[in-house]
């Protein structure tokens, strides 16, 4: 599988700089793209991003997408499987990992105290 990302050596990530709400997410969940681009229309590319949940924010429905996703929980708490009111689900602590093939439903998600996730998204362009 070809990976097309620019070369970036170690650099300080501006954690206080610009964060953007991803399409389909509620306010309070924001991303910072570290490297790469993911073209969901042409189904090509890859990206690595940080995803930040503010305290108390939650999503109300599962997510499903057509690309691979790998997630590593860097800090904070993440609850997976809450209902549309943000209740219930299973709580995870830092140093938790997930790998999801395309088409895998996942979520909804919630964070009580906030969290930061490191995510890689990519299309398998050999198919």
Ranges and model annotations:
Residues 55-59, 64-84:
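Glycine- and acidic-residue-biased ligand/ion/polar-headgroup-sensing regions
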Residues 82-103:
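Short acidic-glycine-tyrosine-enriched beta hairpin
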Residues 1-45:
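A short, N-terminal "cap"/entry segment at the start of jelly-roll beta-barrel domains
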Residues 42-43, 59-65, 82, 89-90, ...:
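Short histidine-centered beta-strand/loop micro-motifs
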Residues 30-60, 98-101:
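Generic detector of solvent-exposed, compositionally biased contiguous segments
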Residues 91, 102-126:
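Ligand-binding loop in jelly-roll beta-barrel domains
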């Amino acid at each position: 599988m070809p990976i097309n990302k620019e070369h970036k050596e170690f650099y300080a990530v501006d954690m206080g700089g610009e964060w953007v709400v991803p399409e389909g997410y509620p306010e309070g969940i924001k991303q910072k793209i570290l490297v790469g681009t993911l073209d969901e229309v042409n189904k090509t590319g890859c990206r690595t991003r940080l995803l930040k949940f503010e305290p108390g924010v939650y999503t109300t429905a599962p997510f499903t997408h057509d690309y691979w996703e790998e997630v590593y929980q860097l800090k904070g708490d993440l609850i997976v499987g809450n209902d549309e009111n943000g209740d219930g689900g299973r709580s995870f602590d830092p140093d938790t990992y997930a790998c999801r093939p395309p088409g895998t439903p996942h979520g909804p998600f919630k964070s009580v105290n906030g969290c930061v996730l490191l995510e890689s998204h990519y299309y398998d362009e050999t198919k």
